[in-house]
Design a protein with these regions (language model features):
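Cytosolic juxtamembrane N-terminal segment immediately preceding the first transmembrane helix
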Residues: 1-55, 65
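Helix-breaking motifs and short loop linkers at transmembrane-helix boundaries and internal kinks
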Residues: 51, 67-68, 91, 99-100, ...
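Residue-level signature of mid-helix packing/kink "hotspots" within the transmembrane helices
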Residues: 53, 81-90, 140, 175, ...
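Extracellular/periplasmic helix-loop-helix junction of adjacent transmembrane segments
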Residues: 56-88
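Extracytoplasmic gate region of multi-pass secondary transporters
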Residues: 56-57, 178, 263-319
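Conserved MFS/SLC helix-loop-helix module at the cytosolic interface between two early adjacent transmembrane helices
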Residues: 86-126
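Central mid-sequence intracellular linker of multi-pass
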Residues: 156-170, 191-265
């Protein structure tokens, strides 16, 4: 009887020991994912907002006068940026299914950094609109692409805090850009014949480039596309095959009927709900016509706030 009791106790101790080791391995894996996956996407989103808010800071720090921007030029340039951002979101997400995220996200970061550098040489409003549009095409990979990446590494109960940290990094970028512009304008305005707002874009690029390099070397991408023997990557020194196998196995298997690729388009159109929603969006002409009028004719200015009620009436929300 005593032997059986000792045997049961020994089994319980061994079971607890195994469970404890698994918990330690899980925490270590999560720490590595946070350190190399979450850190890169947060840095990417942070510099995304530094670049984005930096444009507005440059506008009020001399760019408006130097380039003779008038009227709604700032609004138009921001609208061009948003058009590029919207246009680029879906293609960027589809590219993540064809090209490893380590390569694509790093490339996009480098590309918009290079375009940011080009902003310091602009001499006209047309140059600004062209660069801002292509900047937005590459920057649009960040938000939706990041949530796709995070959803591939983290379980459902692990995502909220990571998503909050990721979103917060963008807000920090907005604040940092303002402080940086103040310092640049104070110390570099006129240095080497360049206005302070031009130095802002140069320094933005100098910050963006190391982040792109960091992503290419240390960011592991997706668990399914990551190997412990990856070339040109530090993944083989960060994760071992056992950890990568566990990272893939601990998440629920993907339902192939919800797979996002080029076959998604005909699936949506064939489905009655998706097709009807698309047609309804085009049919509700009042929605986009009212915005078109507001953008092209009146513009978003304080003196035009009086038109807001008329726009709301046009859209049918008030009698």
């Amino acid at each position: 009887m005593m032997k059986e009791s000792k045997s049961i106790t020994q089994h319980e101790v061994e079971r607890e020991s195994v469970s404890s080791k698994r918990a330690i391995k899980k925490r270590l894996l999560l720490f590595k994912i946070d350190l190399f996956v979450l850190s890169f996407v947060c840095l990417q989103y942070w510099i995304n907002y530094v670049d984005r808010v930096g444009f507005t800071n440059a506008y009020i720090s001399g760019m408006k006068e130097d380039l003779k921007m008038v009227g709604n030029d700032l609004t138009v340039s921001n609208t061009v940026f948003m058009i590029g951002y919207i246009v680029g979101m879906v293609p960027n997400n589809l590219m993540l299914l064809c090209v490893p995220p380590r390569i694509w996200l790093s490339f996009c970061t480098f590309a918009w950094g290079l375009l940011t550098l080009g902003m310091y040489k602009v001499t006209s409003f047309k140059h600004i609109c062209a660069i801002r549009f292509f900047q937005a095409l590459f920057e649009s990979c960040t938000f939706s692409g990041t949530h796709f990446v995070l959803g591939s590494w983290y379980k459902e109960d692990e995502l909220p805090i990571r998503s909050a940290i990721f979103t917060g990094s963008g807000l920090v970028g907005s604040m940092f850009s303002g402080f940086m512009q103040t310092s640049i304008f104070t110390h570099l305005n006129g240095r080497n014949g360049l206005a302070g707002w031009r130095w802002l874009f140069i320094i933005d690029f100098c910050i963006t480039l190391p982040i792109a390099i960091y992503g290419f070397i240390f960011f592991p991408g997706l668990p399914d596309q990551t190997s412990a023997v990856s070339k040109f990557s530090m993944t083989r020194y960060i994760f071992n095959e056992q950890e990568l196998h566990y990272a893939r196995r601990r998440l629920p298997a993907r339902d192939e009927s919800t797979r996002l690729d080029w076959s998604t388009i005909p699936r949506v159109l064939k489905g009655g709900t998706g097709g009807c929603s698309l047609l309804f969006g085009f049919w509700e002409v009042r929605t986009w016509v009212s915005h078109l009028i507001l953008h092209l004719h009146y513009g978003y200015k304080t003196k035009n706030i009086r038109w807001r009620k008329e726009i709301i009436i046009l859209r049918g929300y008030l009698p």
